[in-house]
């Protein structure tokens, strides 16, 4: 699916059919947990790549930051290797949960967001490595809470 998306972004960017889908029905019976984040639709507007992430379920405390971050980075990667600018990531979580007793975690005063930096020299999607990315100014809040995760 990734190869097809990359091909279309370069050769058919006006297409409204540039998407991935992780929901393989024939494999669901073998999975302990069905995919939560299951589809991304890419849309090119001018020279800007935008995306919509659909997710069937999400726990706000344990998964939101991971999901938003990893798919935002994916948009940046796809845009860079396709000669586009990264635009917006819209996110639709269909069954969002916030555990009781952890509201204080959500109400804490945040800190300034770090800067995301990606190696501008990478032009082949499959040549990205973990060293291709870094965060500058990351100052996380302490987090000692134990949050239960439902499987």
Question: PLM features: residue spans?
Answer:
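Terminal, non-catalytic protein-protein interaction segments that mediate quaternary/complex assembly
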Residues: 1-151
């Amino acid at each position: 699916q990734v190869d097809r998306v990359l091909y279309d972004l370069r050769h058919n960017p006006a297409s409204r059919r540039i998407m991935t889908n992780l929901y393989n029905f024939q494999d669901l019976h073998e999975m302990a947990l069905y995919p939560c984040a299951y589809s991304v639709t890419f849309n090119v507007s001018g020279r800007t790549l935008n995306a919509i992430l659909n997710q069937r379920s999400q726990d706000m405390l344990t998964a939101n930051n991971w999901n938003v971050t990893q798919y935002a980075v994916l948009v940046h990667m796809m845009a860079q290797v396709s000669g586009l600018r990264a635009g917006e990531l819209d996110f639709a979580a269909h069954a969002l949960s916030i555990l009781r007793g952890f509201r204080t975690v959500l109400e804490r005063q945040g800190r300034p967001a770090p800067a995301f930096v990606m190696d501008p020299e990478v032009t082949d999607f499959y040549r990205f490595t973990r060293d291709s990315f870094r965060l500058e100014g990351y100052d996380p809040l302490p987090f000692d809470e134990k949050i239960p995760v439902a499987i």
